[in-house]
């Protein structure tokens, strides 16, 4: 598709994040359909877009900017594309996601945070 998948930025735009053990995350560079860049300005625009995405993701996670770019541009993971596929705990190990867990784990975490906030407001 055009530009960039929104999945990772959405997943990390939180205070806490979970991924189920079998879920995958595709870390890839900004791209468009086709293989041509028609003008230098297009290349520059794509670099700017990618830099904004990388900055957003790295500022909302524990992954370093250089490591994220390395995963995005990996050539050895997929036969006909650039990028890296991370499965469950690999996303946590890389620092993109905070925890491996399911919906129940996320709900329990949220309930705990609500209780902590209530207690803090009582003081």
Regions found by a protein language model. Give the residues of each.
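N-terminal organellar transit peptides
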Residues: 1-123
